[in-house]
């Protein structure tokens, strides 16, 4: 059930009324039920994957929170089990094709069937959110959550599960534990964000998409100027699509009394690649900084090691965006560009989510 669908426009007023008419002590249960119902609206059986990730990280964090010399092993096992569904559903065919391409010139043939299952909606987002919670418990940034209902809602919270933003436990769990009464001003702000997000997605992105697709589908017959204009329009299209959906998620959450992180901050006004990543998909940039870049050593090491840490972080970013060489190369280009900026001291920092500092 996408926010720009007719089904959601019919369902949300009912969700809104049911949520605020429900006694506060039962609202978490109601919201959890709604979140799973919304998720099962896509492919019902995939709710089992959501449940797997929830129970794996909930149980893993409980074990990790016990001070033990084997905590690193526990974190490794729990982390692998958490990311296993993501690796299987999103990257199985990609890895399968790589193995095939390597073995074929060697005249070695291993027949491995291609998987034809659809990738579960939002698996990249809720898997990263769950892993982030696990890592925060491991690094003693937060205490483990003992209330399974609250934790399950943190992972499955329906406004953000399909396309983010990726929330941290320290930001969202306290809000789940202290649900508020109806706030008219906050709800008004939420509706404004929802409508602006709808405009960006439906009016801007979807309309531009029609033009961009018509050019790219017949690119061999297009002039250089047409391809240039289509590329500019595509930049606006992906911004409207992603930022619009993020704004809708933030707006829906705000109507229900929750505050989610702002995911975009005028990215095309950035003054450098580094600044761009402080403004574009901010919640992912923060996640990569906290759970990839800093654990690798961040900038508190030699220059060469720091450059490698930046490169590895953006390589992970490219892989996360899609199981395709295009995304991997895209991640490498951004990583190399940011390394060049750092080496030549061309960075201009604006914002708080800095990859390149730790």
Regions found by a protein language model. Name each.
Residues 1-357:
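Membrane-embedded transmembrane alpha-helical bundles that form the catalytic cores
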